[in-house]
C-alpha cells in the first residue's frame, strides 16, 4: 500500500470529528509534512475555522493552507515581496478555489450543494488539500519541496 495522501489525512481529522476545517488542515499538514509545529502554533490556527469563527470571512482550511505555503517557502529574514515562489503557489491555490467553488467566503461555501457529500465543507477541504499537496510536491512547474 502506498503512502497516505494529504487529503485522506485531512478527511480523517475532519469527517465525523469535532475539528473545524482549519484544525483538520493544520493537524494533517503538520503530520503529513513532518513539520513538528508546536501546540502554541496549533492554538494560533485554531480560531481560523468557520471563516475565522464568524462565517463572515475566508475559508479556514484555505487560510491554514496559505500559512503552510508561507512556512514551507519563506526563507529566514525574507520579506513577503522576496518570496515569489510562495506568492506563485498562493495564486495557484486561490485560482483553484475560485474556479472550483466560486468564492473563498465561508458562508457561501457552506451553502453549496455537492452531490455525494452531506457537508459541502468536506468536499471543499478535500479539494484544497489535494491542490495544496500538488502545489507543494512540485506540480505545475513549482520547485520540488524538500519536506517529503
Mark where each language-model region is.
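Polybasic, low-complexity association/targeting segments
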Residues: 1-17
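Transmembrane alpha-helix interface/packing and boundary motifs in multi-pass membrane proteins
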Residues: 47-56
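An acidic intrinsically disordered interaction segment
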Residues: 17-37, 92-99
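Acidic-glycine-rich active-site phosphate/pyrophosphate-binding loop
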Residues: 1-2, 29-47, 100-106
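Phosphate-handling active-site elements
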Residues: 32-43, 71-86
Amino acid at each position: 500500500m502506498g503512502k497516505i495522501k494529504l487529503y485522506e489525512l485531512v478527511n480523517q481529522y475532519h469527517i465525523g470529528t469535532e475539528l473545524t476545517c482549519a484544525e483538520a488542515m493544520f493537524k494533517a499538514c503538520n503530520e503529513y509534512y513532518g513539520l513538528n509545529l508546536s501546540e502554541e502554533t496549533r492554538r494560533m490556527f485554531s480560531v481560523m475555522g468557520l471563516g475565522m469563527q464568524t462565517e463572515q470571512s475566508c475559508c479556514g482550511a484555505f487560510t491554514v493552507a496559505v500559512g503552510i505555503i508561507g512556512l514551507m517557502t519563506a526563507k529566514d529574514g525574507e520579506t513577503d515581496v522576496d518570496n515569489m515562489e510562495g506568492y506563485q503557489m498562493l495564486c495557484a491555490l486561490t485560482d483553484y478555489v475560485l474556479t472550483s467553488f466560486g468564492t473563498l467566503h465561508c458562508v457561501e461555501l457552506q451553502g453549496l450543494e455537492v452531490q455525494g457529500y452531506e457537508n459541502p465543507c468536506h468536499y471543499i477541504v478535500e479539494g484544497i488539500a489535494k491542490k495544496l499537496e500538488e502545489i507543494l510536491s512540485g506540480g505545475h512547474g513549482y520547485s520540488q519541496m524538500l519536506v517529503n
